[in-house]
Each structure stands twice: as C-alpha cells, then as structure tokens.
C-alpha cells in the first residue's frame, strides 16, 4: 500500500472532495521442467488504487496483494506515505527516491526521508535512511522462493543540488551496509559475507539550446567485501582510511 505526496499548503484552494480509483486482478499459471519449481503452479495478484483529494490535500492509495506473500523472501505487500507542506516533502514507510543512476537509483527502502526544495532559491537538499532488504536466513528459506541467503541491508543517502536557469548540478552520496548479526549461519561454500559500500557522485546538465542539453555523471565507489574482517590500512588508497565510519577499510 502506498500513500504519495499530499500538498497541505493547498487547503481551501480546491474543491472539497474528489474521489477516483480502480481495481485490477490477474491470475498466473506456472510450470518448470528440468529444474525445481520456484513457486506454486497457480497464484493470483490483485492491484487497487484510490485517490482522495480533500480541500487540496491529495492522498493516492495503492495496494497490491498476492497469494504468494507468505512465500516471498522479501516483502510483497508494502505501504508508505509522502506528505508535503510548502517546500518540504517527507517520506515514511516503503518509499523510492532517485538521486542518480550511479548512487541512489530509485531503490525501494523501508524507512524515512526528506526533500527540501524552496521555490525562491535554486538550491535543494534531500536525505534518507532505511532498510533496503531484510535478512534471508539459510535455515529458513522458503522452498519456492528461489533465493540465496542474504544479510539484512541498510543504507543512507544524501543529495544537494543547485539549479540555475542554464542547468543543474547535483552532489550525491550513498552508503549501504549489511548487518553481520542478521544471519545466524552461513555455509562457507556459498561465499555469503556481510559487505559495505560507499558511493559519491556528481551529475547534472547544461542547457545548450532550447532543445539541447548536455548531461554528465561521474561516481566513485568503495566496497568492503567482508565486514567481519579486521580493519587494516590501505597504502595505495590512503583517502579511504580517512573516511571514518562511512566505510571500513580492510583487506
């Protein structure tokens, strides 16, 4: 279920109440030959949406329900809300934000975020924190999920942007990390270890003509394969040792 942006600043400027929506349903038949079945041979999915607009406050609701929910390794039924007041938009619950293609590229997360975009100045900021995937314990994997064991994954991201008339410039950062304590046991042969990643990027565009824009993007990523290893110095990449708690450096 999802609640999208509601502009509280528009109260009294619209009709009192407007309602619209729709419902759709589908059934799926599944079969596999030569490999184990990854789901039931028959399942259904129902999608519904309802939009309420009360005195300028828009509250779009959407929901997806499936007979497979109890067998998915990751959540299928999800919900969230994104209320908006003037230049500030808050995001709570299951949300998806897109900062850039190389850092925070529209990944869904369960948590909280905020966007601030004033109308009178060309600067805007955004930040988020939340859980991106829940843990999949190797001792409790659904038989039809077709999933590998995985650690619980959390992340935080931030963006600051400048948008003059001739273009746009964004500085972005994403830090993701997996919780080593979220999985009780892993088979060494699977090579599943808790990792961490830090990505810092810059992107933007420059207006060349009325119909032509030059877009650019650059990002640099540092990845720690196993958080269970002891920290160590990296002589060839000394800048990584100065990033503090953002990314642990080890062999």
Give residue spans per PLM region.
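Outer-membrane beta-barrel channel domains
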Residues: 7-251
């Amino acid at each position: 279920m999802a609640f999208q942006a509601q502009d509280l600043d528009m109260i009294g400027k619209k009709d009192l109440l407007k309602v619209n929506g729709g419902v759709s349903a589908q059934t799926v038949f599944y079969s596999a030959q030569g490999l184990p079945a990854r789901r039931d041979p028959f399942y259904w999915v129902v999608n519904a949406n309802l939009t309420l607009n009360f005195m300028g406050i828009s509250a779009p609701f959407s929901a997806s329900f499936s007979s497979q929910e109890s067998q998915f390794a990751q959540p299928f039924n999800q919900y969230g809300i994104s209320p908006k007041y003037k230049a500030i938009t808050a995001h709570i619950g299951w949300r998806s934000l897109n900062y850039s293609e190389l850092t925070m590229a529209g990944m869904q997360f369960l948590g909280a975020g905020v966007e601030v975009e004033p109308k009178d100045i060309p600067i805007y900021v955004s930040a988020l924190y939340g859980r991106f995937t829940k843990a999949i314990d190797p001792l409790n994997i659904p038989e039809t999920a077709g999933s590998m064991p995985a650690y619980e994954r959390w992340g935080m991201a931030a963006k600051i942007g400048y948008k003059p008339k001739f273009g746009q410039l964004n500085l972005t950062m994403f830090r993701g990390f997996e919780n080593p304590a979220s999985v009780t046991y892993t088979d060494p042969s699977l090579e599943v270890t808790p990792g961490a990643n830090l990505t810092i990027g810059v992107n933007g565009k420059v207006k060349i003509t009325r119909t032509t824009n030059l877009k650019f993007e650059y990002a640099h990523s540092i990845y720690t394969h196993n958080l269970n290893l002891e920290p160590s110095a990296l002589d060839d990449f000394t800048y990584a040792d100065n990033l503090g708690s953002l990314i642990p450096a080890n062999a």
